């Protein structure tokens, strides 16, 4: 695992925490792990990508890599939740811009949603898992994957 991200699958929820935008090698590794865990679990994963509040804004190349990750991740994941942590203007703008891009590119098909914190993901996880996700989120917090 790269020191530039942390990743763990709890139940069938894949948590990935990025303190900075992932590199090409990171994206390749995450996609390989998605495939491996998808095969191990036997069902599509529920992806929760956590973007640290102090993460730098991705440049054009990094945005393309993130787009590739989400596009290819559809092969292994039922849904992708992108949590952009923080209350600063930069964090709010990132959430608004990504939400706007989903609409502009007409990819608003329910696969990707943008959140401010991991707690706002809980209702969807509960629906998809058919059980209370609180222990899963608690474990992710204990592992430093969520705040």
Label for each model-derived stretch:
Residues 2-147:
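Amphipathic, Lys/Arg-enriched alpha-helical "gate/interface" segment within cytosolic domains
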